[in-house]
Amino acid sequence: MWFEILPGLSVMGVCLLIPGLATAYIHRFTNGGKEKRVAHFGYHWNLMERDRRISGVDRYYVSKGLENID
């Protein structure tokens, strides 16, 4: 019957899900607890560069709040 495919389908789904989740957790672990930022457009790249300059430590993910900007 049709339900005989469910175990195989669930195993395949889990196998496809694991790399995506692992990548997200690895990026979060290596970037100080924040998600990895991706710059698809030039404007987003400029924002990341601005955040890197403002933080003062050459890391875009160590950002300061607006109250700490001179």
From Swiss-Prot:
Described function: Accessory subunit of the mitochondrial membrane respiratory chain NADH dehydrogenase (Complex I), that is believed not to be involved in catalysis. Complex I functions in the transfer of electrons from NADH to the respiratory chain. The immediate electron acceptor for the enzyme is believed to be ubiquinone.
One Pfam assignment: MWFE
InterPro entries xrefs: NADH_Ub_cplx-1_asu_su-1 (IPR017384)
Family, as annotated: Belongs to the complex I NDUFA1 subunit family.
Subunit-level organization: Complex I is composed of 45 different subunits.
Primary subcellular site in the record, as a coarse category: mitochondrion
Superkingdom classification of source: Eukaryota
TM helices/strands, residue ranges: 1-21
Keyword Chaperone applies: no
Protein localization: Mitochondrion inner membrane
UniProt GO cellular component terms: mitochondrial inner membrane; respiratory chain complex I
PANTHER family: NADH DEHYDROGENASE [UBIQUINONE] 1 ALPHA SUBCOMPLEX SUBUNIT 1, NADH-UBIQUINONE OXIDOREDUCTASE MWFE SUBUNIT
Membrane topology annotation: Single-pass membrane protein
Keywords attached to this entry: Electron transport, Membrane, Mitochondrion, Mitochondrion inner membrane, Respiratory chain, Transmembrane, Transmembrane helix, Transport
Protein name: NADH dehydrogenase [ubiquinone] 1 alpha subcomplex subunit 1
UniProt keyword annotation of Mitochondrion present: yes
Gene, per the UniProt record: NDUFA1
